[in-house]
């Protein structure tokens, strides 16, 4: 079974690892067969499962339901679960909501933000709840950003993101996710912190990669993000199957053939 210790060893050894979003039992079992290292029950389910335009309507109960689906069905992957929008504004509600997701079967709680999360991160760590901090393009802040845009460009913005990464790790964060940031910045963050860093649209130098499952299967509504690749129709997927797509993703990340320069930002 993959644990945080496994991911830390991967980072130390320079071994890349995989993460995919997942929301139901059948796909969770397929990912177990493909040996996907980590699974994220993302609040992205609001868009790809529930049909919303953003992640904002997702509730803690939604997240707990889908987390339990995965925990019952995949016994090998490390399971990360998102705390959804406005569910961790105050420390007491954050603790209560984190407990709900951990009791549903999550191993790590994912939250979005920077140094303002440090007190929460430390509190959860002391209570035995590991956190993964999502930096860069944080979808719960889409209205603040004015849309889905690359973050961390320019010296000032890049330094702020690097400082936030160091601060949350110092506070006790066990993992980081970097989304849609320049590849050079992602590399700098990965080298600067001791914990594993997972990238999405952040270049090839992060310790691991994550994609939304629907995206990597070519199930995209509207314009496809630059950082995705359709592993279902890839000619290397000789089975032309979903299981084959998961296995090809695992292989491609491990061997370093995904992502490439075409999937990253400068």
UniProtKB/Swiss-Prot annotation:
One of its GO terms (molecular function) is 3-methyl-2-oxobutanoate hydroxymethyltransferase activity. One of its GO terms (biological process) is pantothenate biosynthetic process. The active site is at 179 (proton acceptor). The keyword Cytoplasm applies. It is an enzyme of class 2 (transferase). InterPro entries: Pantoate_hydroxy_MeTrfase, Pyrv/PenolPyrv_kinase-like_dom, Pyrv_kinase-like_dom_sf. Pathway: Cofactor biosynthesis; (R)-pantothenate biosynthesis; (R)-pantoate from 3-methyl-2-oxobutanoate: step 1/2. It is found in: Cytoplasm. It catalyses: 3-methyl-2-oxobutanoate + (6R)-5,10-methylene-5,6,7,8-tetrahydrofolate + H2O = 2-dehydropantoate + (6S)-5,6,7,8-tetrahydrofolate. Transmembrane segments: none annotated. 3-methyl-2-oxobutanoate binds at residues 43-44, 82, 110. Homodecamer; pentamer of dimers. NCBIfam families: panB, PRK00311.1. Catalyzes the reversible reaction in which hydroxymethyl group from 5,10-methylenetetrahydrofolate is transferred onto alpha-ketoisovalerate to form ketopantoate. This is 3-methyl-2-oxobutanoate hydroxymethyltransferase. The gene is panB.
């Amino acid at each position: 079974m993959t644990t945080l210790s496994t991911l830390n060893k991967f980072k130390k050894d320079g071994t890349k690892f995989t993460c995919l979003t997942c929301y139901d039992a059948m796909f969770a079992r397929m990912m177990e067969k493909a040996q996907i290292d980590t699974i994220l029950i993302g609040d992205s389910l609001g868009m790809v499962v529930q049909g919303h335009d953003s992640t904002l309507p997702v509730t803690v109960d939604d997240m707990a339901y889908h987390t339990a689906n995965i925990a019952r069905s995949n016994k090998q992957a490390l399971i990360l679960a998102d705390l959804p929008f406005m569910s961790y504004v105050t420390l007491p509600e954050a603790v209560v909501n984190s407990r709900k997701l951990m009791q549903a079967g999550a191993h790590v709680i994912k939250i979005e933000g920077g140094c303002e999360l440090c007190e929460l991160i430390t509190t959860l760590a002391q209570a035995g709840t590991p956190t993964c901090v999502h930096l860069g393009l944080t979808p719960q802040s889409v209205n603040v950003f004015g849309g889905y845009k690359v973050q961390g460009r320019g010296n000032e913005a890049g330094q702020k993101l690097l400082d936030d990464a160091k601060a949350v790790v110092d506070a006790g964060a066990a993992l980081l996710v970097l989304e849609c940031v320049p590849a050079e910045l992602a590399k700098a963050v990965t080298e600067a912190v001791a914990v594993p860093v997972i990238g999405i649209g952040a270049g090839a130098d992060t310790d691991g990669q994550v994609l939304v499952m629907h995206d990597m299967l070519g199930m995209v509504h509207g314009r496809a993000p630059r950082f995705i690749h359709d592993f279902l129709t890839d000619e290397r997927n000789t089975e032309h199957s979903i299981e084959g797509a998961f296995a090809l993703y695992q292989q491609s990340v491990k061997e370093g053939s995904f992502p490439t320069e075409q999937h990253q930002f400068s």
